[in-house]
Design a protein with these regions (language model features):
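Short basic/glycine-enriched coil/helix segment immediately N-terminal to the Walker B
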Residues: 9-17
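Generic beta-sheet signal
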Residues: 17-19, 52
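A cross-family signal for key residues in well-ordered alpha-helices
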Residues: 6-7, 38
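Short, small-residue-biased leader/transition segments that mark boundaries at the very start
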Residues: 1-5
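C-terminal lobe/lid and adjacent interdomain/linker elements of RecA-like ASCE P-loop ATPase modules
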Residues: 34-135
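Walker B catalytic acidic pair
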Residues: 22-24
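Conserved D-loop-proximal element of ABC-family nucleotide-binding domains
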Residues: 26-30
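Generic recognition of flexible, low-complexity loop/linker segments
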Residues: 7-9, 61-62
């Protein structure tokens, strides 16, 4: 993480501020992201209740050891392209459930529509053969 980013994290924790980060997973190593989330979730390192709000595509973060269900939110595009925001807490899910696995299976929505790419995959296979073959 850059020095500026580190200062923003420390400032948020020291003063109980809200830190908003777009594409949190693109800014640093996954081990660092988990540690930073831990800093914000700890009463010891975050006594002023600072908030970390971020977007990510890193499904490894969908983990009950990092987040409560009410801290995990998903987006889903409707037929008009508008995004709907909803919480994992809206689902009847055990706290110990494998959030990442169930998300990737489509249980909570928010999964891209792969069907839109099927024709592209078919065209590539027709032109170059199976896309599963090793190069």
């Amino acid at each position: 993480a850059s020095d500026v980013y580190k200062r923003q994290i420390i400032d948020a924790l020291d003063h109980g501020k809200r830190l908003v980060v777009d594409e949190f997973d693109s800014k640093m190593h996954p081990l660092l992201t988990s540690r930073i989330i831990g800093l914000f979730n700890s009463r010891v390192t975050n006594p002023r209740n600072a908030q970390l709000i971020f977007t990510t595509h890193d499904t490894n973060l969908l983990n009950a050891s990092l987040f409560r269900r009410d801290q995990i939110w998903f987006t889903q595009k409707d037929s008009f392209g508008a995004s709907e925001l909803y919480s994992l807490a809206e689902y009847k899910v055990r706290n110990s459930a494998p959030f990442e696995k169930e998300y990737l299976m489509g249980k909570y929505g928010g999964i891209p529509v792969i069907g839109q790419f099927e024709r592209l995959f078919d065209l590539r296979e027709e032109e170059y053969g199976s896309t599963d073959e090793q190069a």
